[in-house]
Amino acid sequence: MTNIVVVGLQWGDEGKGKVVDWLSNNADAVVRFQGGNNAGHTIVIQEKTYKLNLLPSSILHNNKLSIIGNGVVLDPYALMSEIDNLRINGININTQNLVISESCPLVLNIHKEADTLFEQLRQNTIGTTNKGIGPCYADKISRRALRVCDLFDKKDILYNKVNNLLNYHNLLRQNFNILPIEASKLVDELLDIAPKILPFVKPVWKVIHDLTQQNKTIIFEGAQGTFLDIDHGTYPFVTSSNTIAPQAFVGGGINLSHSSCVLGVIKAYTTRVGNGPFFTEQKNEIGKSMFERGNEIGTVSNRERRCGWFDAVLAKQAIILSGVSGLVLTKLDVLDQFSEIKICTQYKYDGVIYDYIPASSYVQNNLEPIYETVPGWKENTFGSVTYEDLPKNAISYIKKIEEILKVPVYLISTGPERNAMIIINDKFLK
């Protein structure tokens, strides 16, 4: 099997975790290449549900290497909590199956507090998870962040780095009349958590290079979705990292000569958590029905997801940005209840037709979707095991999506369980 990059083509929550878990059977390693514990993957194995935030989905498999790449911002306390919870549930996690990049910036409590403060300052809140992700990435870009490798430092060297970080954060806290953080206290906290993290730490770029030299198969696991990308998303309602496929090379530490298949994971309808434009949102019984049947609750935020019709304009743009080779269609069964189904094929604003998402947030907020209506099937697709099992109109719907997007559907997820997957085209597995 070739190396595979798995990305979400909407606003996250497309089902990437299940897809990566399924693919892990035929892979040697899985790399998380961006984001932090603000994203969540839900995986169901033999009716038992696992919720992952930082750990790659491969951690639930035996003899697979799980890698947290340098593009991830790492909350050491959240990571250890996640590891401890999995160990309680019988999942073996050790230095042989988990590797953490020495270059990962550290998410600290000061970042979470800053996240909350910045959200309060905004006129229009962006719906942050308050996990400290944005402020940590800001420290990284400003070259003051603490990184995992700093935990190897002697106490006096670490103190100087902490003091440099607090020069900024304590000034921020002063402006909000919040007590400053003592450098010595933060140093002690870091030295306390360090022995739990450091055994997993290696130069990930070298680990990945060695795997490629041995012709091992690597999956690069994206978090969130294309339109939460800091550059290409619906700004400012975005995350603080790049979420599209090219980020796998930067955030994983692999060079461009190692060609990869890009799988785009996409729901048969559209959802979004939090604030921001949503062009096909259904604030009616249709949206409510999608929400209830799809159990659309955020894994991390525990917030209700907004629901709407499939947006082919959004999907096509995401496919171009990531160079998607094939699609994984998820939650088709949520549409089983509808006699008619709509697909957005264009937008309209101020008399102008758009076949892409304009960058202007003002225009985005005023785009009107133009729909094409196709017949529904009113038959159960949940748990279908072959393509031929699907209702005729469900197959027509899938083919319509392929026709509009000009990319084939490789896989169809027919339920939350690991093996609830229909393979239409398996060439990427060879």
Swiss-Prot record:
IMP binds at D13, E14, G15, K16, N38, A39, G40, H41, T129, R143, Q224, T239, R303. Binds 1 Mg(2+) ion per subunit. This is Adenylosuccinate synthetase. The lineage of its organism: Bacteria, Pseudomonadati, Pseudomonadota, Alphaproteobacteria, Rickettsiales. It comes from Ehrlichia ruminantium (strain Welgevonden). Keywords: Cytoplasm, GTP-binding, Ligase, Magnesium, Metal-binding, Nucleotide-binding, Purine biosynthesis. Signal peptide: none annotated. One of its GO terms (biological process) is 'de novo' AMP biosynthetic process. Mg(2+) binds at D13, G40. The gene is purA. Belongs to the adenylosuccinate synthetase family. Pathway: Purine metabolism; AMP biosynthesis via de novo pathway; AMP from IMP: step 1/2. GO terms for molecular function: adenylosuccinate synthase activity; GTP binding; magnesium ion binding.
